[in-house]
Amino acid sequence: MKKPLLLTLLCMILAGCDNPKSLESFTPEMASFSNEFDFDPLRGPVKDFSQTLMSENGEVAKQVTGTLSQEGCFDTLELHDLENNTGLALVLDANYYRDAQTLEKKVQLQGKCQLAALPSAGVTWETDDNGFVVSATGKEMKVEYRYDSEGYPLGKTTINSQNTLSVTAKPSADPRKKLDYTAVSRVDDRQVGNVTQSCEYDAYANPVDCRLVIVDESVKPAVSHHYTIKNRIDYY
């Protein structure tokens, strides 16, 4: 037997030789929080992370940072939307997330550490048998969320008294490149926007650097916005 073939067979038997790590599904908490707080979901034993969205001029438009326990619960989550001058910082305390500055109870939890209610806004979340948030109900709206078999978010539909807004995402066929996706936004039956993202990935199949193009089709002619996303991820 030739030596290269022997080495190949040994690699297959031992499942080593620098093969990528086996894929892990997205946890219910990671998938659901990414849906609700608008960031890219991550796989594997994430300890802490940051995602920074930058405009084509190199200016920071949005940043999300979080720390997680070994059980996959978000211990802290901080969001800064510089384009809209909004922000949020949450810290886990038993069955609630508190405001990190005022310590006011903001988000009520269910199960291990899943979203249950946002009392100040009158919003409640419902989960499926696997623990994924599948709907959010408020005073004047309802949101329904969709996932694939790995827990990857496939979009959502928001229904209120005026219209129905739907976002439908289609990830790459390559299971290791889930964050390479296209998405279409519609108001009722009218397409109003589309998004395309492509990324480079680490050994856990998590995105490291991404390029994001958002096209606003609600105006004529349509306007494209180009962004880059820088991810820093530490693992247990």
From Swiss-Prot:
Covalent lipid adducts (S-diacylglycerol cysteine), residues: 17
Record membrane topology: Lipid-anchor
Signal peptide from the UniProt entry: 1-16
UniProt GO cellular component terms: plasma membrane
A Pfam family it matches: UPF0257
Highest taxon of the lineage: Bacteria
InterPro entries: UPF0257 (IPR010646)
Subcellular location: Cell membrane
Keyword Cell membrane applies: yes
N-palmitoyl cysteine lipid sites: 17
Keywords from the named record: Cell membrane, Lipoprotein, Membrane, Palmitate, Signal
Family of the protein in this entry: Belongs to the UPF0257 family.
NCBIfam families: PRK02939.1 (NF002798)
Name by which UniProt lists this protein: UPF0257 lipoprotein YnfC
Gene: ynfC
